[in-house]
Amino acid sequence: MPLTFGEYVLFKGRGLYTISEGKIVNSFRGCLDDLEKLTYSTYLCELIDISMVDDESNAVLFKELVTSLYLLNSNALDNEILMRAFEIKLLKATGYALDLENCCKCKRRLSYCDYISLAYSGGVCNRCEKSYGIPISSSTYNILRYLNFYSLDNIYKLKINDNIKKELYSIMKSLIGSIYQRRPKSLDMLDIIKESGDKNE
């Protein structure tokens, strides 16, 4: 079953693993019964797929994924905020942590930032050249810093307006595409869901 979190005993054959024992911990029914949640959860799993190689293990990233699925399943916070937070945790867990406290080029402390470098994965100060990146509002930059600093289960109180959500989506989509060189297919469905929601407002 898709999205089934469990404890398994695996036996490795010549090329594939076979499950010899298993215990289901959570099947995340709330995600499976809702198209939007199912699409978001599929996106989370796709991010894992594009950011890791076969047989690679990453306990930190696994914990972030399971936490995100629990939060998504329980309606604990805004789905879009959760996706952006997980994307940031993904970058950090795979060695591409965003540098949002210091200029990613000259390393000067940032008191203000209006540009994110895709090449260096971080904020750029006003003294350094701004190229191959994305302009960003100060409000969105502060939200990025917040999501980068706090754990997933501590962001449920965060409220973000639609303009900042769109800016965050654009920035993280560009960063992930630039770093991992692959685009999750579920993004197409997410774009359709977002467009449908915008038309209904």
Q: Language-model segments: which ranges?
A:
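Non-catalytic alpha-helical scaffolds and adjoining flexible linkers that form interface surfaces
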Residues: 1-201
